[in-house]
Amino acid sequence: MGRRAKMVEKVKSLMETHDQIRNMGICAHIDHGKTTLSDNLLAGAGMISKDLAGDQLALDFDEEEAARGITIYAANVSMVHEYNGKEYLINLIDTPGHVDFGGDVTRAMRAIDGAVVVCCAVEGVMPQTETVLRQALKEKVKPVLFINKVDRLINELKLTPEELQGRFMKIIAEVNKLIEKMAPEEFKKEWLCDVVTGKVAFGSAYNNWAISVPYMQKSGISFKDIIDYCEQEKQSELADKAPLHEVILDMAIKHLPNPLQAQKYRIPNIWKGDAESEVGKSMAMCDPNGPLAGVVTKIIVDKHAGSISACRLFSGRIKQGDELYLVGSKQKARAQQVAIFMGAERVQVPSISAGNICALTGLREATAGETVCSPSKILEPGFESLTHTSEPVITVAIEAKNTKDLPKLIEILRQIGREDNTVRIEINEETGEHLISGMGELHIEVITNTKIGRDGGIEVDVGEPIIVYRETITGTSPEIEGKSPNKHNKLYMIAEPMEESVYAAYVEGKIHDEDFKKKTNVDAETRLIEAGLEREQAKKVMSIYNGNMIVNMTKGIVQLDEARELIIEGFKEGVKGGPLASERAQGVKIKLIDATFHEDAIHRGPSQIIPAIRFGVRDAVSSAKPILLEPMQKIYINTPQDYMGDAIREINNRRGQIVDMEQEGDMAIIKGSVPVAEMFGFAGAIRGATQGRCLWSVEFSGFERVPNEIQTKVVAQIRDRKGLKSE
C-alpha cells in the first residue's frame, strides 16, 4: 500500500471517532502566508513531498491562483496527525485573504469549528485579519494565532530579543483586543490567545519551522537559539528540531474543539429551530445515527464530475445513492458520489457521518449555504443564511462576442451565481447584455477572464465598470395617497427614515429580510425592540426588505389582511429603485396609515393593489428629501516615511479622508477612507507615488452620503447611463 492509500484508510477509520476529529481553517490577510503554511502542514503529514512544499502551493490548485500567487477559492483537504500517542483526523480548509474573495471565507467558516489565524510578524494585524477574525467569531469558530515570517524580523529588520518579544506582544494584544470585542459573551475570556498555555505559535511557514512556549519547554529551544539559527542561515536545521507541522497541529489538537464540543454551542447560533426536538438534540450531540442535517459550504465545478458540493454534516450520515432534500431550493437530489477531499483530488468513501466535511456529487441545484436533509425528515427551518460583511459594489455589463455562445454564457452565469453568493447576476435574454456585480476589480476580473473565458471557453466583451449606489431619505413625507389604476382602492402612507440603531442592527445581521404573514413573530419583535424600534411599531411590521421596512399602522380594515401579500409585493417593487436615479433604497420606513378598498374582490386584485402601493411608496420617498449614497472603502497604506506625503496626497486627490496615522521605525501606517468611485487605477498610482515600496489594502466599509456639490452631477450621469429622462 502506498503512503496516500494508507492515509486514506486511516482517514476512513478516524471519521467515526468524534473526539479525534478537528475541523479547522487557516485564515489571514493576503500574502501573510496561509497557503505556504497549509502546504507545509500537508507535507509534514505525508500528503505531498517535502521538497516541493512552499513552492508547490498544493492548495492553490487552480491555474489562475498559481499565476497570481494568491488563493482565490477555499480549498479542502483531510489528513492524519499523531499527538500524545493518539492519531487525529484533521479536515483543513485554506481560505483566501484577498478582500475581493471574502465570500469564500464566510462560507468556509460555516464548515469549521476552529481556525488558525495567521499574522505576518512584519506587517502585524491588517484589515483583512480583522475581517476574517470577525467572521470566525460570528460563526462561533475558536481562534488560535500563528505569527509568521519571524525570520524576516531577525534577518531583515535585525531586531534584538527584547524588540522581538515587544513586537509579538503588540500583535497578540491587538488580536486579543479584537477577540474581546467580538467573541461570544461566554467565551470572551476563554478564547483569548495566551502565549503560556500555547495558543500562540511563532515561526516561518516558508522555512518550515515553528515554536510555541510548550514546545520550547519540551525541546529546550530558546528565543536566543532561534535568532542564532536565523542569523547563521541554518533555518533548515531549525526545521528539523522544531518542525512547523508538529507545532501547529499539536496546538490545533490541544486548543481547538472537536465537533462534539463545538456543535453544542455552534448549532443554536446557525439554526433557529427547536433545540429540544429530535434533530435539535441530535445536532447538539453530533449523532451519526440521528436525522440527517448538513450545510453546503461551497460549490466547486469540476470539468469531469460537474458540480461538487462541499458539505459539513452536523447530524446523521450520507451514503452513496441516498436520496437527499435541499431545503432552500425545495428539491430532492441523489448523492451520486460521497468522497473526502485531498487537495485537488477527491477520494470516494462508502459513507460520511456527522462531524465531518465531505464532497458530494449529484446536487445539481445546490447553492452555497444550502441546507441538506432527508426527504423523510425535512429540517424546518433550514440553517441561517450565510451573511457576509461586504456587499457587491462594482458592476460590469458583459456580452458574448459570438451570438452562438449566448445559451452557454447564460448557463455559466447561472452556475457562477450558485457557486458564489457574493456575486449578483442579472440576466437579460432579450438584449443579450448581462450584469455581474462583484466585490472589487479583481473579483470581477477573475469571473470574466477565468470562469467565463478560460473555464467556459467563451469570448466576452466587458463594459466599463459601474459603481453601485444606494438612495435613502433624510426627512419625513406628508401623507401620500396611492391610487389603483381603476381609482377604487386608495392607500395612505408616510415615508420616514428608519431609526439609525435599527438600520445598524440590520447591517450587523441581528435583523434580516423577512415577510410576516399575520403579524411580527415574537423573536423578530424582541430583536426590533432591542434595536430601538417603538414597541407599538415592532408588533406591526409587515416586511423587512433590503434594509427597508413597511409597518401597518391602520386599525380595523378587514380587506387589508387579504391584500397583505400584494401590499408587501408593491412595497418591494417601490423600494427597488429610488426617485433620484432608480438605485436601490435603504433605511426607508413606510408607515401605512389608512386604506379604502372596493368591496368586490375582483376589483382589488394584483393588477390594482400592487401599482397603487408601488406608486405611493415612490411618491412618499421622493417627497421625504431623498439623497444618494455611495460605497466607501477603508484603506490601509504601509509605506516608508519618505513617501508618506505622496501617499497622503494620493488619498486626498481621490476625495479621501485620512482617519489615522502611526509611525513605526522608518515606516508610516496611514488609515483612510475613500469612495469606491475614485479607486479605479489606484494600484498603479500608489505604486508610482511610492516607487513600489508600499503595502496597501482596502476593505468595504458601508455606504455614505454623496457630497452635495457633486450629487446633481452623479445623479445626471447615472440617469443618462440608464436611459432615464433627465430631471
Swiss-Prot record:
GO molecular function annotations of the record: GTP binding; GTPase activity; translation elongation factor activity
Pfam families assigned to the protein according to its UniProt record, in alphabetical order: EF-G_D2, EFG_C, EFG_III, EFG_IV, GTP_EFTU
Modified residues (Diphthamide): 603
Binding site for GTP: 28-35, 94-98, 148-151
Annotated tr-type G domain residues: 19-260
SMART domains in UniProt: EFG_C (SM00838), EFG_IV (SM00889)
Gene Ontology CC annotations of this record: cytosol; ribonucleoprotein complex
Record-linked PROSITE patterns: G_TR_1 (PS00301), G_TR_2 (PS51722)
Subcellular localization: Cytoplasm
Keyword terms, alphabetized: Cytoplasm, Elongation factor, GTP-binding, Nucleotide-binding, Protein biosynthesis
InterPro entries: EF-G-like_DII, EFG_II, EFG_III/V, EFG_V-like, G_TR_CS, P-loop_NTPase, Ribosomal_Su5_D2-typ_SF, Ribsml_uS5_D2-typ_fold_subgr
Role this protein plays: Catalyzes the GTP-dependent ribosomal translocation step during translation elongation. During this step, the ribosome changes from the pre-translocational (PRE) to the post-translocational (POST) state as the newly formed A-site-bound peptidyl-tRNA and P-site-bound deacylated tRNA move to the P and E sites, respectively. Catalyzes the coordinated movement of the two tRNA molecules, the mRNA and conformational changes in the ribosome.
NCBIfam families from the UniProt entry: aEF-2 (TIGR00490), small_GTP (TIGR00231)
Similarity section: Belongs to the TRAFAC class translation factor GTPase superfamily. Classic translation factor GTPase family. EF-G/EF-2 subfamily.
Name of the protein: Elongation factor 2
Annotated source species: Methanococcus vannielii (strain ATCC 35089 / DSM 1224 / JCM 13029 / OCM 148 / SB)
Gene: fusA
